[in-house]
């Protein structure tokens, strides 16, 4: 049995060593070893310190008790004392060390708290009550709380050891009717009591500051009752606890325990009065009858702090007197916006990309494609883009061997991108970059995708020079076996060429084939942790990552002679929940909508935050997996502190190429959090805020299934907001009336300038500017839900769509876009049709119609193109040209006379392929 235990311990140690050693290799390959060693160095150092302090507390209290008076021999007790004396190392070393490990080592898990405090930087903003810089609450207060919690552990462990030791050595005894303590024991306990009282005083003193971080029913931060009733009482109690500490010392020296007991009793009763009774009466009889007036000062503090903490203190607000009548030529001044109006829905057309561009079953595209912009032939264009990633699930069961999974099928290939504002005449995406090999308007770039969101868990790549390539590169008709092979030539993973490395990685992945396979050569590398989010979160463990990762083909070095790179771009946030008076918000709740499908943030983040900054833009190369962290926010004190903790890991934004800069955008999750807060905090008057009468809601997704309460997602598109000089790539959302009734009436519209510019190392002026337009209360402007209802209840639209459905065709309503143009609000929605799923894998959605409406009294536009639909809505001529103006559909737009006949024709058109497909099957 002992042999088995030893073997088990050795095996466990080997596994731990293998995991640590391989992690070191991974970080070293990324030139980020300092991140690994800094994390573990601080964690081990603090864990060791906590262990030693707790162990020392146990040791000192035992020694103090041991040197006390010894009583006469007590049957049944002295035998234990004799055992301890016979093995002094047990009590003096082993027990304290064991207690230290159990209760003290956890201090290592708080390494972030301590390193941030050591490298803290000021916020330059003071709290409204005590005048402390915000950095005190973010960096210092957590350390003080941690130290007090550690003190409680030290005293608790010390007290338990003291009681046990005094009992064993006779300092504590019983004569049958009462417990007898020697004078030395009373002194010992008096000192411990004094220290405990000081710790309580410390907790009470810090509680004063924690009031500013509290959540109240109506707002966050300290309230009138907190400041005027609870705060004075807690301050008095804290001072009283210091006096009690003095009484404990007096009792220890003079033996006057009566005064100590009286002091504790009086303080306990006073504590109930000043922390419970007085605040209750103040709240009930002073605040409740006059709440708006009494709380206004504190609500205003909450409003100001929340706007500052969430980057909402510079929102440009304006009133927008929206028209509801549409007239010919009304969009003439908005031609730039309508030209880029997106009719391709990135959340619907993934199956279309898959059917038309996948090429082989072992490739796949993301379920939600990305919206970006590229300059094509000198013209900026909104685009929809996705990466053709490797998907091993597309292989047959017979193809799923270790060799294939880990050495042959190693990477995806290229991007596919289509114009966002137009389609082909058949309703399919109009691709400008496509195919294998990748061809199109993006120029020459490295198309191989070794690092992506769906890459295999690990691949072994690389081979000696002259070896026949065995990695499948891409399918081609020009070779004997129909594929072109390649050998990885990058530096993307740790070397795995020698026996020791193979053994370590075989243990890590629990895979013996890694050790024995001949495909693992002296020139091999192992690629793992290939998801861009995983790589960034390991290199920057302090960041919360946006739920969206998007690809871009970018000139990284600014040299047009070198090939571009395919990269993944991620937005990183620094957050805290320690900003005084700022409202707390759950990131997962604020960012959940109909598009997120449960995807949340990745990385380090508290459950709720009350401060957030998009401090870092991360870029991961899809070929070699290299990670670059660009410091996007130079003023954020939290990221500045982390840059001192991990020096050299952040790249100044000034080193970003112009082409990469042009693909930076305002982060989606940040915007969602801000819109959630602005639904309430657009009200900046404290008394109006208290009433809540003008609070808004985010509209629910109008295309979601009945009964769903999912929020409508914000959308990236090019638009010109009222007061803006020209149309810019933006992220936008609407607001509707708040309250339990959920009236779908538009009350506001928020957009943020998401155009970072294309100047190397410099963000364009205007990027990140939030613009909020508020609609007049005396005009009823339909919200997204009303607009969707108007579309579906229009006789022409409903007849056509119902007939299509009867013919076996699935009708899919695309994203409902809202645009404040033409002096009102324009709604645009593409309509997709898809053959029934019973027709097999050839079923995919194509854009068939575009719906438009402007105000509650306007005509519904319903046509194969946006151009025609806008003209229908605006009296035959909208005055502007849409991006699909030159597209002619393969059937005419439905008219009042031909609507039924047209729909029946389309129904047959889609039903027949279904029958043919079934027949051939």
Regions found by a protein language model. Name each.
Residues 3-920:
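Soluble extracytoplasmic regions of secretory-pathway and membrane proteins
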């Amino acid at each position: 049995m002992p042999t088995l235990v030893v073997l088990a311990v050795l095996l466990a140690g080997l596994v731990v060593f293998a995991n640590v050693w391989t992690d070191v290799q991974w970080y070293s390959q990324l030139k980020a070893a300092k991140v690994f060693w800094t994390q573990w160095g601080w964690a081990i150092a603090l864990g060791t310190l906590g262990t030693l302090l707790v162990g020392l507390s146990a040791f000192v209290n035992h020694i103090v008790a041991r040197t006390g008076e010894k009583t006469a021999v007590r049957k049944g007790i002295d035998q234990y004392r004799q055992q301890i004396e016979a093995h002094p190392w047990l009590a003096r070393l082993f027990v304290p060390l064991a207690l230290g490990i159990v209760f003290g080592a956890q201090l290592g898990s708080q390494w972030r708290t301590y390193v941030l405090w050591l490298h803290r930087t000021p916020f330059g903003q003071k709290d409204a009550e005590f005048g402390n810089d915000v950095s005190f609450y973010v960096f210092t207060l957590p350390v003080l709380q941690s130290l007090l919690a550690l003190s409680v552990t030290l005293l608790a462990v010390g007290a338990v050891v003291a009681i046990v030791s005094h009992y064993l050595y006779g300092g504590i005894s019983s004569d049958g009717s009462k417990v007898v303590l020697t004078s030395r024991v009373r002194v010992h306990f008096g000192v411990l009591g004094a220290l405990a009282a000081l710790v309580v005083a410390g907790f009470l003193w810090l509680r004063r500051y924690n009031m500013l971080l509290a959540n109240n029913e109506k707002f966050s931060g300290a309230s009138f009752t907190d400041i005027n009733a609870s705060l004075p009482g807690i301050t008095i109690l804290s001072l009283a606890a210091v006096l009690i500490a003095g009484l404990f010392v007096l009792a220890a020296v003079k033996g006057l325990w009566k005064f100590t007991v009286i002091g504790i009793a009086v303080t306990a009763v006073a504590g109930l009065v000043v922390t419970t009774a007085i605040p209750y009466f103040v709240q009930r009889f002073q605040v409740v009858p006059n709440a708006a007036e009494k709380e206004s000062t504190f609500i205003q503090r909450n409003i100001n702090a929340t706007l500052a903490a969430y980057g909402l203190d510079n929102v440009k607000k304006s009133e927008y007197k929206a028209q509801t009548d549409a007239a010919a030529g009304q969009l003439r001044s908005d031609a730039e916006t309508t030209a880029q109006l997106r009719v391709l829905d990135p959340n619907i057309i993934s199956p279309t990309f898959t059917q038309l561009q996948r090429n082989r079953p072992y490739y796949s595209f993301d379920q939600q494609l990305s919206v970006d912009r590229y300059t094509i032939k000198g013209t900026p264009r909104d685009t929809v883009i996705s990466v053709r990633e490797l998907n091993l699930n597309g292989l047959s069961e017979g193809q799923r061997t270790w060799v294939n999974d880990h050495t042959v099928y190693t990477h995806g290939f290229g991007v596919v991108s289509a114009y966002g504002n137009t389609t082909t005449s058949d309703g399919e995406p109009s691709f400008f970059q496509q195919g294998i090999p990748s061809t199109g308007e993006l120029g020459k770039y490295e198309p191989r995708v070794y690092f992506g969101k769906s890459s295999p868990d690990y691949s072994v790549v690389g081979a000696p020079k002259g070896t026949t390539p065995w990695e499948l590169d891409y399918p081609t008709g020009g070779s004997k076996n129909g594929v072109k092979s390649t050998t990885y030539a990058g530096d993307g993973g740790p070397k795995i060429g020698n026996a020791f490395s193979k053994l370590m990685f075989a243990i890590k992945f629990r895979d013996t084939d890694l050790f024995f396979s001949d495909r693992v050569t002296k020139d091999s590398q192992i690629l793992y942790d290939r998801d861009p989010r995983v790589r960034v979160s390991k290199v920057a463990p302090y960041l919360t990552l946006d739920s969206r990762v998007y690809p871009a083909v970018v000139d990284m070095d600014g040299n047009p002679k070198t090939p571009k790179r395919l990269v993944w771009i991620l937005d990183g946030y620094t957050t805290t929940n320690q900003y005084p008076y700022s409202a707390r918000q759950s990131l997962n709740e604020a960012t959940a909508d109909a598009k997120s499908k449960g995807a949340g943030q990745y990385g380090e983040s508290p459950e709720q935050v009350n401060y957030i900054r998009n401090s870092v833009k991360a870029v991961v190369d899809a070929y070699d997996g290299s990670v670059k962290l660009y410091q996007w926010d130079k003023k954020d004190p939290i990221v500045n502190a982390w840059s001192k903790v991990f020096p050299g890991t952040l790249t100044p934004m000034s080193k970003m190429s112009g082409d990469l800069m042009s693909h930076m955008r305002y982060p989606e999750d940040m915007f969602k959090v801000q819109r959630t807060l602005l639904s309430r905090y657009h009200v900046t008057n404290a008394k109006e805020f208290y009433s809540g009468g003008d609070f808004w809601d985010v509209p629910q997704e109008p295309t979601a299934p009945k009964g769903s309460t999912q929020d409508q997602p914000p959308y990236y598109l090019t638009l010109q907001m009222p007061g803006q000089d020209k149309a810019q790539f933006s992220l936008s959302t609407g607001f509707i009336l708040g309250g339990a009734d959920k009236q779908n009436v538009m009350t506001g519209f928020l957009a943020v300038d998401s155009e970072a510019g294309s100047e190397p190392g410099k963000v364009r002026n205007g990027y990140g500017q939030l613009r909020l337009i508020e609609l007049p209360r005396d005009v009823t402007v339909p919200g997204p839900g009303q607009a969707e209802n108007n579309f579906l209840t229009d006789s022409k639209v409903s007849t056509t769509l119902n007939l299509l459905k009867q013919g076996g065709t699935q009708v899919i309503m695309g994203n409902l876009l809202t645009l404040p143009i033409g002096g009102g609000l324009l709604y645009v929605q593409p309509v997709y049709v898809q053959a029934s799923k019973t027709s097999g894998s050839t079923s995919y959605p194509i854009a068939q119609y575009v719906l438009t409406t402007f105000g509650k009294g306007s005509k519904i536009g319903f046509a194969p193109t946006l151009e025609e639909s806008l003209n229908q809505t605006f009296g035959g001529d909208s005055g502007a040209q849409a991006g699909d103006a030159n597209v002619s559909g393969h059937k005419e737009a439905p008219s009042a006379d031909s609507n039924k006949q047209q729909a029946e024709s389309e129904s047959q058109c889609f039903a027949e392929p279904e029958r043919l497909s079934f027949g051939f099957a």
